[in-house]
Amino acid sequence: MSKKSKNSSIEFDAIVVGGGHAGIEAVYALLKKKLKVVLITLDKKKLASMPCNPAIGGPAKGIITREIDALGGVQGKFSDLAMIQIKYLNESKGPAVLAIRAQIDKEKYSKLILKDLKKQENLLIIEDLVSELLVEKNRVFGLKTAKKQVFFSKTVIITTGTYMDSKVLRGSLAIPSGPDGQQTSNLLSNNLKRLGFELQRLKTGTPPRIFTSSIDFSKVEKEVLPVYNINFSFQSKHKIKKQISCYLTYTTAKTHDIINKNLGKSSMYSGLISGVGPRYCPSIEDKIVRFSEKPRHQIFFEPETKKQDIMYINGLSTSMPEDVQLEMVKTIPGLENAKIAKFGYAIEYDALNPLELKKSLETKKVKGLFMAGQINGTSGYEEAAAQGLVAGINAGQFVLGKKPVEILRNDGYIGVLIDDLVTKGTKEPYRMLTSRAEYRLILRNDNADIRMAKYALKSGLISKKEYLKIKAKYAKIDRKILELSKEFVSPKDELAKKYNLEKRISKLKLISWPNVNFKDILPDFEFGYELTVMARLKGYIQKQNSEAQKMIRLEKLLIPGDLNYEKVANLSSEALDKFQKVRPKTIGEASRISGVNPADIQMLLFHIKVLKMQKVSKI
């Protein structure tokens, strides 16, 4: 790597600011493209840390992690190596919403990533704080740090999470700090404001942690799980041998009384917090106020590491003062003698308005500047990692002079996530839900590999050989489906007796029945589950694919980049405002902007058609 004599500055292809889940994925994506990268982080021992729950996956989120893996990312691989428990969620609700969730040894996870990154060529890890982006003629060319270092690069990816001008809040205390007592980065926040970026205040929180030795496990319910032979990563061979349990208990009437009596002491309810919190992960104070009719709320004890010395108290996120936290904790069965290892807190921070972004996650204002993760208004490790991977891919494409990679809504939850952010924006921490995806029957846990394959190949994150291997897998499934359609079970066969068949039926039709175990028909076929899902959902899949094609046609209708929306006749005032702010690239994007109605789209289409006719008439 070439060093410049002035200011000890160094030239790189890309700089990644922040070593959280988004930053790590961005780094790996860039390294896979053979680019020279510097990662600037506050503490390299806390790479991809888990300051909130020690888990990866869950409804929709687990599918995102599978997509990250299929796209060439690393979250799934490292989760498999660090997991202490893994399970399926929503098994009874069908394959469209089936997802994986794993408890992670958070310390091991960070150590594995640091160890692996130390082996990587073309990577320099710096412990520092970014103070200023270097921008000239609306293009980023490097940055300065708090330690007076200067780095030049062709692109910069900001993945600062909840650290920008962040405050940790507990009771009446408001301390300038990042999560886990780390330094806040108000210098970068102020710099972004000076560059004209629109920032907003958001809030999240975390519960207290309890020393395991102080818990009375005789008063709580132990989660008993089978040993699932599953992984996040399609490539992983690591299997968990023993499931470490979580535990369930509940709040009590006494818990609720203490919270109600002390609401005014909560940072959230005292007016100390101005940021908007996550709708789908409310604090215990919010639960008691919003759901006052409920006599109790679930509380889960989740081990933070394999040592199991500290438990994360899921469901008890709070910004109460320490004395109130201790008082309410002791009213929960199993925690009467609890000793708190770390008190809960709320954290308020600056986040970018994601309408400032293109679908590539490059900013509209500054070329070569990309944003990913919680800085874009999302919540969750999985959502952050997905954005980091996409930003890393597209920063690499930018450096190499190639077109950006943009994942469509019908191809992945990652596509839904980014499309929602850049077309609708968000005023609260955005969490991925299966209900946000209109094509969720085709965005399943089992088929993430084939859905992401073309994007991974285009990105250069998988080889042509790996791509063809995935294609061969599904070709094999298609051939087996054809075979089963030609093979029949008669009423005299043993299989017919097991399932009370009264007439001859094809094996394909039989396997599509919900009560049939596919292993009875395909005992040795390695992709039996995938085939069964395809057989059972065939009609629904065809319908959603047809609907997706309509969406794709709208995506192909481009909107001129210099279009003057004020000249579009009969647009609603809200549509005009949103179009000018978002500046959608396609009619498809325009149609998904909140507040835009079908009449606005018709007016826009008509205006573009007139412009095209005027151009033709001038020729």
UniProtKB/Swiss-Prot annotation:
Gene3D superfamilies hit by this protein: FAD/NAD(P)-binding domain (3.50.50.60), GidA associated domain, C-terminal subdomain (1.10.150.570)
Location relative to the cell = Cytoplasm
Quick one: where is this thing mainly located? cytoplasm
What is the organism field in this record?
A: Mesomycoplasma hyopneumoniae (strain J / ATCC 25934 / NCTC 10110) (Mycoplasma hyopneumoniae)
Gene for this chain? mnmG
Give the superkingdom in one word.
Answer: Bacteria
Q: Which SMART domains match?
A: GIDA_assoc_3
Function recorded in the entry: NAD-binding protein involved in the addition of a carboxymethylaminomethyl (cmnm) group at the wobble position (U34) of certain tRNAs, forming tRNA-cmnm(5)s(2)U34.
Q: What is this protein called?
A: tRNA uridine 5-carboxymethylaminomethyl modification enzyme MnmG
Q: Which residues bind FAD?
A: G18, G19, G20, H21, A22, G23, V130, S185, Q374
The record, for Pfam families, names: GIDA, SAM_GIDA_C
Residues annotated as binding NAD(+) are: 277-291
- Quaternary state and partners of this protein? Homodimer. Heterotetramer of two MnmE and two MnmG subunits.
Q: Which GO terms describe its cellular component?
A: cytosol
Single GO BP term: tRNA wobble uridine modification
One GO MF term attached to the UniProt entry: flavin adenine dinucleotide binding
What is its cofactor? FAD
Coiled-coil ranges from the UniProt annotation: none
- Which cysteines are disulphide-bonded? none
InterPro entries per UniProt: FAD/NAD-bd_sf (IPR036188), MnmG (IPR004416), MnmG-rel (IPR002218), MnmG-rel_CS (IPR020595), MnmG_C (IPR026904), MnmG_C_subdom (IPR047001), MnmG_C_subdom_sf (IPR044920), MnmG_N (IPR040131)
The record's annotation in PROSITE patterns points to:
GIDA_1 (PS01280), GIDA_2 (PS01281)
> Which UniProt key words apply to this protein?
Cytoplasm, FAD, Flavoprotein, NAD, tRNA processing
Per the record, the similarity remark reads: Belongs to the MnmG family.
